[in-house]
Swiss-Prot record:
The active site is at residues 173, 601. GO terms for molecular function: phosphoenolpyruvate carboxylase activity. One of its GO terms (cellular component) is cytosol. Through the carboxylation of phosphoenolpyruvate (PEP) it forms oxaloacetate, a four-carbon dicarboxylic acid source for the tricarboxylic acid cycle. This is Phosphoenolpyruvate carboxylase. Keywords: Allosteric enzyme, Carbon dioxide fixation, Cytoplasm, Lyase, Magnesium, Phosphoprotein, Photosynthesis. GO terms for biological process: carbon fixation; leaf development; photosynthesis; tricarboxylic acid cycle. Homotetramer. It catalyses: oxaloacetate + phosphate = phosphoenolpyruvate + hydrogencarbonate.
């Protein structure tokens, strides 16, 4: 310990109480929750690693807090000296402790949000939601607003809600920094904390919960946070599917009941039909092969069978509860006849069930029917298990459910019979919930989208045309390609046989189509073509599906993401719709995906957001001309730089008429945990998406005035030029980026199954959008989010001072512009150029220091212009909740930032000398529990402990920032 007077060192807990803003409202329990978790954790830290280490944690925290108060860079240096003087084991423990404390702060927040939500529901009042500066409506408020304020009839609301669809597409983007083992422990900590503050808790309950809390915090701290091997796509799929087990499976029927209740409260005495497609789930895990060589046809087959097995297992685990519930003897004639037939034909085979294992008596007809459903579910599950394990199954396909209609039929029969016998209230119990689950999840739990780059299809067709000796498809013009594709699609002859010469890549593409042909059609959703530019890209996939004998072809979805592609998208889609063969094929429905990540990386956030807005307007116009219903599929990331931010705000700021009751949106990486990690979060996510989609359709946001459009067009050009002049044209930029951020070390984190680069060599262009953002988030500089905004606003205001008033008017009256600015403001609130300056000082060569200073001056300039336009004196002045939450975690994050900067220095500069603490002899070191941590990574090529310390800081900062990639 340094010579600072220990007696004067305040505990973190006391520090917190001084630091934290006052309670934001009466029902604000965040500080209490946070302090309780911290107290418990510090006790555990002392027990496991001794008092010295606990005091070092407190010293680091205090120095960070002092820095946060005055932003004095000397404090960062002092903190750096404390951190670099630690031996390798202690250094890992400190990084682990701060990372852990940030995870605990997140859990305290989630419990606080749930608590305030319950308080709100008790009072039936409205409140500004805490995760953004705008009020979020629940489903009941949305209905009342539509009927009361906007004078829609209850019937109109009912018709709109039962015909709308929100399809949430879970993707395994490599940003879920927390291991599944830890997510489960975090869930239990959350539960303990929520129960500890329940009103009716007894002293004994309290004591037991406190012990459980201590146990779970210790178990989480004792779990290795670092993945020692990269996850496979199957691992990612299993991780994604675990949310269905934990929350989504039960959450969907519970949410739909709330919709029923809300309808009742506006005078509609009907329930949402059980087959109304309100919520759907899809997945990219194991289907997204764009730039991921690890997603092979075998992987796709595996994840589909795995999902079918999980779905059958979930239904199977619930069917006996339903059999218990439906014990009635009275039924209609149709059901009686069916039950009698089953009784006669059933010979009990050797399956030993726990309940209803003997033949069900004939006076329980519903149980007879459901017993047969149970048998089939058992066979369905076992067949999928055998196919997954051995590639074949002894169970014949006809003994299982192969499509959803077969599965629904006996359940619908039970429902009709109960209604006919006057037992409607019983029919609307668990049976209705079960029917709704079947309609939502089907037999495959989620539908798997396939994504592939357009070039890979071109390679296959080029091989075919060369084999047929009719030329090189790759060299043909677009017209020639279309002509040939359409003549083949209109004809009947097969294009190629088994003698087609195939490279490994070509075989991979064709085998993927064969897997689609082999598995049941309900396993799959869309076939998405990335880097799509022309109608031939779509027709190529249609032809390959036909050639590989896909009986029910997947809908083909072009994905437009770069700025130029977005600009050309409406014309490309119009050309596609003008092809008669294609119009007949799609039956008046088309889906188009727009990508937020690459457009942001290509042109900066402001221009990307505006281009995405305009492209959607134009695409909808094209679809109207051809009388096609267009569904927009939004590929949003978790971070603001990749189109992230609160979901309902994003929806309500889309252009009018672009959602129209059908929305598809990706839920990525760590956002899955924030959306579905816990029951109330799942409920809230389903509610937000449904309410916002309904409101957007029935009460569209305003269209921008012509003068707003003109100004946006003008400033977007300036923003793009400024962004590209720095990111792509400035010769010093790539070197600066690699030195000033942990981008080069990112690959060591084993976060995802996908490589972080599209091509092994190359500059910023080849870097994926995710590591690009992740790296800047780590240094709290967030460059991709704000770069370009300042130059654009400065240009507009200098050109004509009236433009400042116009920008302020746009902020106040136009949801799209407001949301864009608010999200950047939130990122500024999380940023800190002082931290970026420390990284520069330690890691960047001196000749680049002036470049770093230039970027930081642009950061400050952009921030002040942004506040001027929003009419705010301080960042987040309109959102006290978020401000409080960010202040609470700043000191933890700062310690990790400093730790990361100095660790990178030691990794990159082996000659960097540090002064180790005196009096830690080798024998003493080996006896310390902390040294065991160094041995977890025996193969590291760096000095002991450095690599693990670095990875732990990355994970901790990711947890603190909450939207990492």
């Amino acid at each position: 310990m340094t010579t600072r007077n220990l007696d004067k060192l305040a505990s973190i807990d006391a520090q917190l109480r001084q630091l934290v803003p006052a309670k934001v409202s009466e029902d604000d329990k965040l500080v209490e929750y946070d302090a309780l978790l911290l107290d418990r954790f510090l006790d555990i830290l002392q027990d496991l690693h001794g008092e010295d280490l606990k005091e070092t944690v407190q010293e680091c925290y205090e120095l960070s807090a002092e820095y946060e108060a005055k932003h004095d860079p000397k404090k960062l240096e002092e903190l750096g000296n404390v951190l670099t003087s630690l031996d390798p084991g202690d250094s890992i423990v400190i990084a682990k402790a701060f990372s852990h404390m940030l995870n605990l702060a997140n859990l305290a927040e989630e419990v606080q949000i749930a608590y305030r939500r319950r308080q709100k529901l008790k009072k039936k009042g409205d409140f500004g939601d805490e995760s953004n500066a705008t009020t979020e409506s629940d489903i009941e408020e949305t209905f009342k607003k539509l009927v009361g304020d906007l004078k829609k009839s209850p019937q109109e609301v009912f018709d709109a809600i039962k015909n709308q669809t929100v399809d949430l597409v879970l993707t395994a983007h490599p940003t879920q920094s927390v291991r599944r083992s830890l997510l489960q422990k975090h869930g239990r900590i959350r539960d303990c904390l929520a129960q500890l503050y329940a009103k009716d808790i007894t002293p004994d309950d309290k004591q037991e919960l406190d012990e459980a809390l201590q146990r779970e915090i210790q178990a989480a701290f004792r779990t290795d946070e670092i993945r020692r091997t990269p996850p496979t796509p199957q691992d990612e799929m299993r991780a994604g599917m675990s949310y269905f087990h934990e929350t989504i499976w039960k959450g969907v029927p519970k949410f739909l009941r709330r919709v029923d209740t809300a309808l009742k409260n506006i005078g509609i005495n009907e329930r949402v039909p059980y087959n109304a497609p309100l919520i759907q789930f899809s997945s990219w895990m194991g289907g997204d092969r764009d730039g991921n060589p690890r997603v092979t046809p075998e992987v796709t087959r595996d994840v589909c069978l795995l999902a079918r097995m999980m779905a059958a297992n979930l239904y199977y685990s619930q069917i006996e509860d339903l059999m218990f519930e439906l014990s009635m003897w009275r039924c209609n004639e149709e059901l009686r006849v069916r039950a009698d037939d089953l009784q006669r034909s059933s010979r009990r085979d050797e399956k030993h069930y726990i309940e209803f294992w003997k033949q069900v008596p004939p006076n329980e007809p519903y149980r007879v029917i459901l017993g047969d459903v149970r048998d089939k579910l058992y066979q369905t599950r076992e067949r999928a298990r055998q196919l997954l394990g051995h590639g074949y199954s002894e169970i014949p396909e006809e003994a299982t459910y192969t499509n959803i209609e077969q599965f629904l039929e006996p359940l619908e029969l039970c429902y009709r019979s109960l209604c006919a016998c006057g037992d409607l209230s019983i029919a609307d119990g668990s049976l209705l919930d079960f029917l709704r689950q079947v309609s939502t999840f089907g037999l495959s739990l989620v539908r798997l989208d396939i994504r592939q780059e357009s070039d890979r299809h071109t390679d296959v067709l080029d091989a075919i045309t060369q084999h047929l000796e009719i030329g090189s498809y790759r060299d043909w013009s677009e017209e020639r390609r279309q002509e040939w594709l359409l003549s083949e699609l209109s004809g009947k002859r097969p294009l190629f046989g088994p003698d087609l010469p195939k490279t490994e890549e070509i075989a991979d593409v064709l085998d993927t189509f064969h897997v689609i042909a082999e598995l049941p059609a309900d396993c799959f959703g869309a076939y998405i073509i990335s880097m799509a530019t022309a109608p031939s890209d779509v027709l190529a996939v249609e032809l390959l599906q036909r050639e590989c004998r896909v009986r029910q072809p997947l809908r083909v979805v072009p994905l437009f993401e770069k700025l130029a592609d977005l600009d050309a998208a409406p014309a490309a889609v119009a050309r596609l719709f003008s092809i008669e063969w294609y119009r007949n094929r799609i039956n008046g429905k088309q889906e188009v995906m727009i990508g937020y990540s690459d457009s942001g990386k290509d042109a900066g956030r402001l221009s990307a957001a505006w281009q995405l807005y305009k492209a959607q307007e134009e695409l909808i116009q094209v679809a109207k001309e051809f009388d096609v219903k267009l569904t927009m599929f939004h590929g949003r990331g978790g971070t603001v730089g990749r189109g992230g931010g609160p979901a309902h705000l994003a929806i309500l700021s889309q252009p009018p008429e672009t959602i129209h009751g059908s929305l598809r949106v990706t839920v990525q990486g760590e956002v899955i945990e924030q959306s579905f990690g816990e029951e109330h979060l799942c409920f809230r996510t389903l509610q937000r998406f449904t309410a916002a989609t309904l409101e957007h359709g029935m009460h569209p946001p305003v269209s921008p005035k012509p003068e707003w459009r003109a100004l946006m067009d003008e400033i977007a050009v300036v923003a793009t030029e400024k962004y590209r002049s720095i990111v792509f044209k400035e010769p010093r930029f790539v070197e600066y980026f690699r030195l000033a951020t942990p981008e080069l070390e990112y690959g060591r984190m084993n976060i995802g199954s996908r490589p972080s680069k599209r091509k092994p060599s190359g500059g910023i262009e080849s870097l994926r959008a995710i590591p690009w953002i992740f790296a800047w988030t780590q240094t709290r500089f967030h460059l991709p989010v704000w770069l370009g905004f300042g130059a654009a606003f400065k240009y507009a205001i200098e050109k004509d001072i009236k433009n400042l008033r116009m920008l302020q008017e746009m902020y106040n009256a136009w949801p799209f512009f407001r949301v864009t600015i608010d999200l950047v403001e939130m990122v500024f609130a999380k940023g800190d150029p002082g931290i970026a300056a420390l990284f520069d000082k330690l890691l960047v060569s001196e000749d680049l220091w002036s470049f770093g200073e230039l970027l930081r001056s642009k950061y400050e300039e952009t921030k002040s212009l942004l506040l001027q336009i929003a009419g705010h004196k301080d960042l987040l002045e309109g959102d006290p909740y978020l401000k409080q939450r960010l202040r609470l975690r700043d000191s933890y994050i700062t310690t990790l930032n400093v730790c990361q900067a100095y660790t990178l220095k030691r990794i990159r500069d082996p000659d960097y000398s540090v002064t180790p603490r005196p009096h830690i002899s080798k024998e003493y070191m080996e006896a310390k529990p902390a040294t065991e941590l160094v041995n977890l990574n025996p193969t590291s090529e760096y000095a002991p402990g450095l690599e693990d310390t670095l990875i732990l800081t990355m994970k901790g900062i990711a947890a603190g920032m909450q939207n990492t990639g």
